[in-house]
């Protein structure tokens, strides 16, 4: 393009041998070598000036950042790579081409290797090998690894109040690079929930038991007040059938979920009150259609299918009020049925977004986390290809963004114009892209049939890659269009994840 490429073409000092030759071997009679040189000397500056003017006119249409990128790419790319200014390609097509990257590591040929655990998933969107022995250096390993370049992983589903190393800050101090716990703030959460494990939408059964609630509590030395809460409820004349080792009054040799189906309430009492520590006690109650009465996670509402689907004893002072509520619901069928309405109408989008996370096995999510980290490190290196990430034509600038569904590895391109860097435009661009691909969400085959929808994609959230699931699902939100615009302009080729519901 323009001035530099044209200056590389003609040579300034032409020799006698380079002049046109007539058939008889003499030079053209119309001009001598000296007159030709004079003509070249006369017209060459004019030609150069014209080309410079044209070039400046083109470059002035770019903003400053685009000017730097254009000049950088000019010196590293052939003229065929810079046709966007000539109108041969649209900005989107040009960006798709010049922003493309061939990374130094092809995971299809050189898969992620995780050491210290057997592979426990069928498929994953990034090639990944797990095992105990290999000639290859691991990308990550369970336990504290002292091998340089290998990430150390801790994985546990136990409460941090019983196992201090599961505390996120403690794990970091010990040297773990990747934390996998029940905490949604961990790098790769490993929760007790999933569509595959629990038939959450199972129909409600008749409540035939005389007792209001059932309890299955065997650890009578829990580090919270659950045993005291059980005793206090019994003293309020709430009849409870206890199948566990604590205050047992019923034969414990029953199938738990089947037994719970016939009680109006289930005591989902955890052994600790810890954020995000929500175990099978709660989810089995949902399966059974027995309203869970919770002692446990202070943020239990984030794990509930609807706001009125549970009762929460946050502290001992709440016992009397909860007991009163249980009796009221038991005596008022319409009010009680409201607590189970989600079974018929479907749970909230936030609940579906949470459970959908488990549609991708935690080990696969670990592999994606490691692969993403490897790519990010390469992109930060000085040797990494510089990409324009935006294109300006006239007064309009087009920005190149990348997006993937949560649980996938590969990215898809979307584009936004500078006059429309809005949250609405971002969502529309994401939907348009994935709908054009006839994309099927990860959870499609995992959810119960009644929750798979009508085939139309709906966005629950879009967030920058790198956030924890706590941030992505509950805490993060762009503060209006200006916040999104600033993020896009400050982060060339920004990457996002989308959660579909």
Curated annotation (Swiss-Prot):
It catalyses: N(4)-{beta-D-GlcNAc-(1->2)-alpha-D-Man-(1->3)-[beta-D-GlcNAc-(1->2)-alpha-D-Man-(1->6)]-beta-D-Man-(1->4)-beta-D-GlcNAc-(1->4)-beta-D-GlcNAc}-L-asparaginyl-[protein] + GDP-beta-L-fucose = N(4)-{beta-D-GlcNAc-(1->2)-alpha-D-Man-(1->3)-[beta-D-GlcNAc-(1->2)-alpha-D-Man-(1->6)]-beta-D-Man-(1->4)-beta-D-GlcNAc-(1->4)-[alpha-L-Fuc(1->3)]-beta-D-GlcNAc}-L-asparaginyl-[protein] + GDP + H(+). Its cofactor is Mg(2+); Mn(2+). Disulfide bonds: none annotated. Glycosylation may be important for enzymatic activity. Its main location: Golgi. Keywords: Cell wall biogenesis/degradation, Glycoprotein, Glycosyltransferase, Golgi apparatus, Magnesium, Manganese, Membrane, Metal-binding, Signal-anchor, Transferase, Transmembrane, Transmembrane helix. Its EC number is 2.4.1.214. The record marks 218-219, 226, 243 as: May be important for donor substrate binding. Glycans are attached at residues 64, 337, 420, 481. GO terms for cellular component: Golgi apparatus; Golgi cisterna membrane. The chain crosses the membrane at residues 40-60. GO terms for biological process: cell wall organization; L-fucose catabolic process; protein glycosylation; protein N-linked glycosylation. Involved in cell wall synthesis. Preferentially catalyzes the addition of fucose in alpha 1-3 linkage to the first GlcNAc residue next to the peptide chains in N-glycans. PANTHER family: ALPHA- 1,3 -FUCOSYLTRANSFERASE, GLYCOPROTEIN 3-ALPHA-L-FUCOSYLTRANSFERASE A. This is Glycoprotein 3-alpha-L-fucosyltransferase A. It comes from Arabidopsis thaliana.
């Amino acid at each position: 393009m323009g001035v530099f490429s044209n200056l590389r073409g003609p040579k300034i000092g032409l020799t006698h041998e380079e002049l046109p030759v007539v058939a008889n071997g003499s030079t053209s009679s119309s001009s001598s070598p000296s007159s030709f040189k004079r003509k070249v000397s006369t017209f060459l500056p004019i030609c150069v000036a014209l080309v410079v003017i044209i070039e400046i006119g083109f470059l002035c249409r770019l903003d400053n950042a685009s000017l730097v990128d254009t000049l950088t790419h000019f010196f590293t790319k052939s003229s065929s790579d810079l046709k966007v200014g000539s109108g041969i390609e649209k900005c989107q097509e040009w960006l798709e081409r010049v922003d493309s990257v061939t990374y130094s590591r092809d995971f299809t040929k050189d898969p992620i290797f995780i050491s210290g655990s057997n592979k426990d998933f069928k498929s994953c969107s990034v090639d990944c090998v797990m095992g105990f022995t290999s000639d290859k250096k691991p990308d990550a390993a369970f336990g504290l690894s002292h091998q340089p370049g290998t990430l150390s992983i801790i994985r546990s589903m136990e409460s941090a109040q019983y196992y201090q190393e599961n505390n996120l800050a403690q794990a970091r101090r010990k040297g773990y690079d990747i934390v996998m716990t029940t905490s949604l703030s961990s790098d790769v959460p490993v929760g007790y929930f999933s569509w595959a494990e629990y038939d959450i939408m199972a129909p409600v059964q008749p409540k035939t038991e005389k007792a209001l609630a059932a309890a299955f509590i065997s650890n009578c030395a829990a580090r919270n007040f659950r045993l005291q809460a059980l005793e206090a409820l019994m003293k309020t004349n709430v009849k409870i059938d206890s199948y566990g080792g604590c205050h047992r009054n019923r034969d414990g040799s029953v199938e738990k979920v089947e037994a719970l189906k016939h009680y109006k309430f289930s005591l989902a009492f955890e052994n600790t009150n810890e954020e995000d520590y929500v175990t099978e006690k709660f989810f089995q109650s949902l399966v059974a259609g027995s309203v869970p009465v919770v002692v446990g996670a202070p943020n239990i509402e984030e794990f509930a299918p609807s706001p009125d689907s549970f009762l929460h004893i946050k502290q001992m002072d709440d016992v009397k009020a909860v007991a009163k509520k249980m009796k009221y619901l038991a005596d008022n069928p319409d009010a009680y049925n409201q607590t189970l309405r989600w079974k018929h109408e479907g749970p909230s989008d936030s609940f579906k977004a949470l459970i959908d996370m488990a549609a991708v096995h935690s080990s696969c999510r670990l592999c994606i986390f490691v692969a993403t980290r490897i790519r990010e490190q390469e992109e930060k290196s000085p040797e990494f290809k510089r990409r324009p990430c935006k294109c300006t034509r006239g007064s309009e600038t087009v920005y190149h963004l990348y997006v993937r569904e949560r649980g996938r590895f590969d990215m898809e391109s979307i584009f936004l114009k500078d006059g429309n860097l809005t949250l609405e435009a971002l969502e529309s661009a994401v939907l348009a892209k994935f709908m054009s691909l006839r994309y099927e969400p990860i959870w499609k085959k995992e959810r119960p049939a009644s929750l798979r929808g009508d085939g139309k994609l709906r966005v629950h959230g879009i967030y920058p890659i790198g956030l924890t699931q706590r941030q992505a699902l509950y805490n993060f939100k762009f503060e209006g269009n200006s916040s999104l615009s600033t993020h896009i302009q400050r982060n060339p080729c920004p990457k996002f994840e989308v959660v579909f519901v």
